[in-house]
């Protein structure tokens, strides 16, 4: 295969950066899995096209934010399947991150949106819209009271969204091949390095 990319990275001012890229990947020998006989096979060629944009702004010496979007398109291999590997790769992904960084304390809030991922064309009508596009939020906090010590707290999936990153059946939780991500959870601890 071969990947080509063209892009722009620029500093708009002392506190703002912007980037934009277009990419294309051409694969000659894509490997796929046949569910009927449980064997891998050569599925032929595939072309992936996409683009991304990202804007980062520092509001002061401690607080910054980044907004980004990535768009991906993979043509359907036949009339019986959806684009983007039969709808399992999202057409769009949004990322919005807020960061605070001080000498002893830092934290970040990340909001991620996965949009237009309907799953297989054969089962798409049975997929709830809430599974085709999902939004999640995660929070991470770190405090360094002394050199070598880090006290941390992470709150993942703040809004307790039911979703999956990996599935062979988007219809509902508990369906064939549904691998859900953890619900709201937190991790807290202390690290010490020397």
Predicted regions and their residues:
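Residues on the lipid-exposed face of transmembrane beta-strands in outer-membrane beta-barrel proteins
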Residues: 6-10, 53-57, 67, 96-100, ...
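Outer-envelope beta-barrel architecture signal
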Residues: 14-16, 61-63, 92-94, 103-109, ...
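Gram-negative outer-membrane beta-barrel transporters
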Residues: 22-26, 42-122, 154, 159-162
């Amino acid at each position: 295969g071969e990947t080509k990319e063209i892009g722009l990275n620029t500093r708009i001012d002392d506190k703002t950066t912007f980037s934009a890229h277009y990419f294309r990947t051409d694969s000659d020998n894509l490997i796929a899995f046949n569910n009927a006989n449980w064997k891998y096979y050569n599925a032929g060629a595939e072309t992936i096209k996409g683009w991304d944009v990202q804007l980062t702004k520092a509001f002061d010496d401690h607080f910054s934010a980044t907004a980004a979007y990535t768009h991906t398109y993979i043509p359907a291999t036949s009339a019986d399947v959806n684009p983007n590997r039969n709808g399992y790769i999202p057409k769009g992904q949004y990322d919005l991150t807020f960061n605070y960084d001080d000498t002893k304390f830092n934290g970040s809030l990340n909001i991620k949106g996965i949009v237009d991922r309907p799953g297989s064309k054969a089962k798409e009508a049975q997929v709830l819209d809430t599974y085709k596009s999902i939004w999640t939020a995660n929070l991470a906090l770190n405090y360094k009271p002394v050199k070598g010590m880090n006290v941390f707290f992470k709150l993942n999936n703040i809004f307790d969204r039911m979703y999956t990153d990996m599935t062979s059946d988007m219809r509902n939780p508990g369906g064939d091949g549904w691998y859900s991500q953890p619900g709201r959870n937190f991790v807290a601890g202390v690290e010490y390095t020397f």
